[in-house]
Amino acid sequence: MAFSPLRRFLLAALLWLPFAFFVWFFFAGPLVWPVIALVRFVLLTAWPQLFTAVSQGADLLDVQGRVLEHLPYLMQLSTTVMVDVAEPGAAPRFGMIEPTVNPMVYGYALPLFAGLVLATPVSGRWRLAQLAVGIPLIWIAQAFGVIGESLKIVLIDAGPVGAEAAARAGLSLNLIALCYQFGYLILPSLVPAVLWIVCNRTFIELLIRRDNVEPVAARRVEAPPDGDG
C-alpha cells in the first residue's frame, strides 16, 4: 500500500523524534555547554554587580543535604545578593544566593527540530545544512530562557532584597518577568517550528498542492457511455 508524502513524513517523525530526544538527553552535558558559556558571558558582562560566577554541573541533594549524584547539565550561579537564611525566630544568618538552574527545561526545541529535519524527505546535505544553522539559533533561544530564569530567581524570588538589587542594577522586575515567561512558554516551541517551516517551504508547498489536487481527483467520475437510444 502506497503512503502519501504527508503520511510518510508523519511516520518518519514518529520514529525520529523519540530517537532525537534520547540522544539529546544522553548527551545533555555536552549539548548544554554552549548555552551555559553564552549565559556566563552575558551575565558576567552585563551585570557583574549581581553575578560573580557561572559554572556547569551541580550536585543533587536529598532533604538531609546529602549528595545523591552530580548532574553535568545543571548550571550553578554565584551572586552578590545576600539574604537571611535563618529559620523564623532564630538569630539572623546571612548568605549569598547561589541558585541552580536547569537549562534542559528550555532545550527541548533542539531534539524537536532535529527530529523534524531528519523526518523530512530532503537530501542529506540539506539536512546537515539545516542542523548547522538551526542548532546555534536554538542555543541562543535556550540561553535567553536561562538568563530570564536566572534573573527571576535572584531578583524576583528573593523578595525585597532582590528588588533592591534590581533597582541598583537598573533592571525592571516586570520586564524580567515578561522575558522569563516568553523564554519559558513561547520560545522552546516556537523556534523549532519556525525554523523547520522556513527551511522546508518546498516540501510544505508540495504537501499543500497534493492536498488540493487529491480531493478534485476523487470527485471525478467517468462519463456514462452513450446509449443506443
Describe each PLM feature range.
Residues 16-28, 132-151:
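Hydrophobic alpha-helical membrane-insertion segments
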